[in-house]
Amino acid sequence: MLLAALLAALVARTTLGADVDAVPAPTFPPPAYPYTESWQLTLTTVPSPFVGPADVYHTRPLEDPCGVVALISDPQVDRLLNEAVAHRRPTYRAHVAWYRIADGCAHLLYFIEYADCDPRQVFGRCRRRTTPMWWTPSADYMFPTEDELGLLMVAPGRFNEGQYRRLVSVDGVNILTDFMVALPEGQECPFARVDQHRTYKFGACWSDDSFKRGVDVMRFLTPFYQQPPHREVVNYWYRKNGRTLPRAHAAATPYAIDPARPSAGSPRPRPRPRPRPRPKPEPAPATPAPPDRLPEPATRDHAAGGRPTPRPPRPETPHRPFAPPAVVPSGWPQPAEPFQPRTPAAPGVSRHRSVIVGTGTAMGALLVGVCVYIFFRLRGAKGYRLLGGPADADELKAQPGP
């Protein structure tokens, strides 16, 4: 019996080895679009994952312990790109980072930065990007989705349970999303990777203060392939173990209830409170138009058995345009006469103007008289001759007397 069991195990191992050797080597596909790849762009340190609240999701449960855990959800990046188009910004900058959250700290998993991106294209279509930086043990069985916003975890181990956080930043606007990963109980994948957080040199867990001081990208993360060749590398390892990656993956669901087995020691996140809808203001009630005449109150006729009878209508009074004069008791001061404004005089010649004209006329006459006097004074007899008299004194003496 023991010999038969050993022979069966040898045959099975030989058959598996033949299948593994038959797996062809991966071929690296070309980039989906042209871009320039560099080691760093603007960020030299990994941004902190503790910058604000996060939306919480939990991944789909695995039916196969060696399946693929999909950390996928829509971060609503299209809204930010449409906003950039509306503000006529020609390009935008972005970066994506993944972390594993523990008690008050975070393990680095993945970081990439984009620049000179076209907001009219899908997210990640940029002219410049950095080389994807990975924590080396995670790159062996994790890789980004095709849109580079999700993360796929192939054949996870029990140590992979817990809380993972994604940070997507577009032009300084941060979008945080938490994913809760829980694996089926009592099932283990035989070829799952082992935990290396404690044995690997750079598997430290960084607090918020450490991120604020600066966690260098090039020192604690390792460059790896871009998304298309990275997927082929992980798929090659998966196929060597007799599996094939599925073409589609189910997205995570919002965190409505606790998972069946939350990670031990991980802080339980709280969903972000949704804003309460503001009550709509009620329209003001319409004010009824005042009636022309108020109804007359009813009176009770005791002689008729107490039944209310309406009062007779009041006689109409003629409209008085003005109130009658007030009656002032004797001995009271009489009201003063109302002020009567003066009637303006008819337009005419001003008295001041008449004085000026008269004075000017007199001065003119005086000036003419002075001029005539001087004229005759200077001319002497000549002037006298002009008036019919002698020219000078000698001629006056020569004239015979009467």
From Swiss-Prot:
Residues 1-17 form the signal peptide. Residues 252-350 are annotated as: Disordered. InterPro entries: Herpes_glycop_dom, Ig-like_dom_sf. One of its GO terms (cellular component) is virion membrane. SUPFAM superfamilies: Immunoglobulin. Disulfide bonds join C66-C189, C105-C205, C117-C126. Residues 269-278 have a biased composition (Basic residues). One of its GO terms (biological process) is entry receptor-mediated virion attachment to host cell. It comes from the Viruses. Belongs to the herpesviridae glycoprotein D family. Envelope glycoprotein that binds to the host cell entry receptor NECTIN1, promoting the virus entry into host cells. In contrast, does not use host TNFRSF14 as receptor. May trigger fusion with host membrane, by recruiting the fusion machinery composed of gB and gH/gL. This is Envelope glycoprotein D.
